Amino acid sequence: RHIAFVDRVGDTFRWKGENVATTEVERAFAKVPGVAEAAVYGVPVPRADGRAGMAAIVPAAGQRVDVRAAAAVLARELPAYAVPRFLRLVGSYETTATFKVRKVALKQQGFDPGAVSDPLYVLVDRARGYEKLTPRLYARICAGELRLP
């Protein structure tokens, strides 16, 4: 007999051969000014290895999240592979009876600006930080013309 540790589905994802713990990334968002909550999950990216990190962020009441400043904080707090490639600004989350964020719908919606009405941002260049995810950028990412760092 033996005992094996089995991780909860959704608590980790793989990006470019590395395991990313969503809780570690969510804790890093606590240091980003203007962020009340963050739910982190992996989303498939065409022609990429694994799932890219995406964070659905609830801004603190009456505050704006500076997405460029967020990139700098996350780069300081996390290994490069763990920094989410996509951000989604949301008003609130759908939760379970035990107050856990329902990430399934967020994962299914992915990062398509044509399907998601919330503001979306992408990390194309670490030095510049996050920028607005436009339909043109989305098409270039999906076609493999634009590779995420």
Question: What role is predicted for each listed range?
Answer:
Residues R1-A82, S92-V101, A105:
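AMP-binding/adenylate-forming catalytic core of the ANL superfamily
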